[in-house]
């Protein structure tokens, strides 16, 4: 999960807390020091993949240029499940199956290819 959120989405780790008595680690990530933080929990003895992933809805982030951001993610191996056909919104999933919405800051960008003809993939 850290590879996805840090290396692919560009977030940074701002704090980490080891909790030996509970056998878990909390990792706090943010897009910027002044931004809201995302808390990831690593359970030390979790041997099976987590199930679910959209039982709380989804996480949303705004980006400066949705086309550039989606292109960067594709180059890093992230599948764009709902392409930004409208110049405003896209969906991806984390390796733990968390649904992530990407939103264009401000008004939608002009519609452009290849995004406008791309189909949805899977569940988002």
Question: Model features per residue range: what roles?
Answer:
Residues 1-37:
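Core segments of cupin and vicinal oxygen chelate
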Residues 5, 50, 91-94:
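A general structural signal for stabilizing positions within well-ordered secondary structure
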Residues 14-18, 28, 61, 67-124:
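Vicinal oxygen chelate
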Residues 20-22, 35, 47, 106-109:
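Flexible, glycine-rich phosphate/dinucleotide-binding loops
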Residues 32-36, 45-47, 66:
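Short, charged/polar surface micro-motifs in flexible loops or helix N-caps
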Residues 49-52, 82-83:
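Short histidine-centered beta-strand/loop micro-motifs
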Residues 54-58:
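Eukaryotic phosphotyrosine signaling hubs
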């Amino acid at each position: 999960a850290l590879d996805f959120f840090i290396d692919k989405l560009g977030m940074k780790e701002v704090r980490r807390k080891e909790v030996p008595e509970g056998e878990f680690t909390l990792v706090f990530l943010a897009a910027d020091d002044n931004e809201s933080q995302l808390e990831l929990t690593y359970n030390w003895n979790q041997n099976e993949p987590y199930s679910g992933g959209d039982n709380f809805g989804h996480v949303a982030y705004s980006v400066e240029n949705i086309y550039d951001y989606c292109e960067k993610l594709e180059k890093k191996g992230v599948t764009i499940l709902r392409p930004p056909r409208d110049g405003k919104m896209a969906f991806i999933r984390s390796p733990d199956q968390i649904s992530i919405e990407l939103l264009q800051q401000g008004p939608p960008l002009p519609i452009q290819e290849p995004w406008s003809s791309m189909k949805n993939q899977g569940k988002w």
